[in-house]
Amino acid sequence: MIFEIIVRDKKTRARLGKLKTFHGEINTPVFMPVGTQGAVKTLSPEEVEKVGAEIILSNTYHLFLRPGHEIVRKGGGLHKFMGWEKPILTDSGGYQVFSLARLRRIDEDGIYFNSHIDGTRYFYTPELVMEIQKSLGSDIIMPLDICLGYGASYWETKEALEITLRWLKRSIDYKNNSNMDHQLLFGIVQGGFYKELRKEAVERMLNIDLPGLALGGISVGEPKDKMYEIIDYTVSLLPEEKPRYLMGVGAPEDLVVGVSMGIDMFDCVLPTRLARHGVFYTSKGRKNIKNAQYKEDFSPLEEDCDCYTCRKFTKAYIRHLFLQHETFSYRLLTIHNLRFLFRLMENIRKSIREGRLEEFKKEFLTEYLRDDRENRLEKEELWSKLLI
């Protein structure tokens, strides 16, 4: 059994589980930090492990362009290449092709696109994506799919779904004939924000024996309430026995709400990206280290945080470093933001085990959203909906 459910929450769809991979077990629900180029930005693999990561995500598209999957293969695979011994999930790069690449063109065979780096023309196919991920040797792999932005028409979304499903079959065929048994291929449920299409995608995927299912096409410009609505609906259709992966979503409030809806796996660039812009997480919302109020603040970023940053340094010191563009400040903020999310996931798992996830969710959201001054009106509206 690849995925084992240990505890089911009685009041929500949340589950406590273990996902077995070639490079070890993962406790779920789990957050995966993103190491796009084969490294979590500013941190060493040892630091990433110390903050609590059990699995990381790397990007097929970026590693294909640089250094090239053949280089990684010759280096012994991605684990050895980057010095990470725990599980790795690689996404297909489909989202990046649609968001970064120039002059892309899609047909039944694949995607033609120009590299965002130097304009080189490439042809990205389901088979090539599988070949790249075979060379990388990642534990969990994703098929090429078409990810559309919010607002795409019904017929555009339906056509994209049909192609995505056909590409999934081609990906499975390639994997089955390529000595990739140790790699877990998840399916990606697309369908945009049309419930009928999401339902069709799930029903057709249930006829295929996949070890896990991912929700794609989420967090692509839609309002938060619409995002939660489509997540909740789609998860209600998914089989209990398979892990559920919500792609590209990982704000603190999204983790708590997503777990209560039945999501097992999350990834997001937000904690590392925000850190490089001076933003850090606290139990009372996001704060910005550049603010003048921290000039003579000799307290840690978060009083009860056990991370290296909070044990050793003050807001005043980190603010000083950040304003001088010292890269050490990016590292310190990244360590804190990731540890904040991993502590949050630890508390979520503990609350599921103790049968009090709903209470924890209300306590966390009340504290986290109430004092967040950024986008105050939007946050207050979201807060009222989440606590219903």
From Swiss-Prot:
**Which GO BP terms apply?**
queuosine biosynthetic process; tRNA wobble guanine modification; tRNA-guanine transglycosylation
Which region ranges are annotated with the description RNA binding?
248-254, 272-276
Q: Where does substrate bind?
A: D91, S92, G93, G94, Y95, D145, Q190, G217
> What Gene Ontology cellular-component terms does the record carry?
cytoplasm; cytosol
Its required cofactor(s), as named, are: Zn(2+)
Q: Which Pfam family would be a valid example here? A: TGT
Free-text comment on the cofactor? Binds 1 zinc ion per subunit.
Instruction: Please name the InterPro entries in this protein's record.
Output: ArchSynthase1/Queuine_TRR (IPR050076), TGT (IPR004803), TGT-like_sf (IPR036511), tRNA_ribo_trans-like (IPR002616)
Which Gene Ontology molecular-function terms are recorded? metal ion binding; tRNA-guanosine(34) queuine transglycosylase activity
Question: What is annotated as the active site?
Answer: D91 (proton acceptor), D267 (nucleophile)
Question: Its catalytic activity?
Answer: 7-aminomethyl-7-carbaguanine + guanosine(34) in tRNA = 7-aminomethyl-7-carbaguanosine(34) in tRNA + guanine
Q: What pathway, per the record?
A: tRNA modification; tRNA-queuosine biosynthesis
Q: Which UniProt keywords apply?
A: Glycosyltransferase, Metal-binding, Queuosine biosynthesis, Transferase, tRNA processing, Zinc
Residues annotated for Zn(2+) binding in this entry: C305, C307, C310, H336
- For this protein, the Enzyme Commission number is 2.4.2.29
Q: Which HAMAP family match?
A: Q_tRNA_Tgt
Entry-linked NCBIfam families: Q_tRNA_tgt, tgt_general
Q: Which family does it belong to?
A: Belongs to the queuine tRNA-ribosyltransferase family.
- Subunit structure as annotated in this protein's UniProt entry: Homodimer. Within each dimer, one monomer is responsible for RNA recognition and catalysis, while the other monomer binds to the replacement base PreQ1.
| Role | Catalyzes the base-exchange of a guanine (G) residue with the queuine precursor 7-aminomethyl-7-deazaguanine (PreQ1) at position 34 (anticodon wobble position) in tRNAs with GU(N) anticodons (tRNA-Asp, -Asn, -His and -Tyr). Catalysis occurs through a double-displacement mechanism. The nucleophile active site attacks the C1' of nucleotide 34 to detach the guanine base from the RNA, forming a covalent enzyme-RNA intermediate. The proton acceptor active site deprotonates the incoming PreQ1, allowing a nucleophilic attack on the C1' of the ribose to form the product.
Record protein name field:
Queuine tRNA-ribosyltransferase
What is the organism field in this record?
A: Dictyoglomus turgidum (strain DSM 6724 / Z-1310)
Gene coding for it = tgt
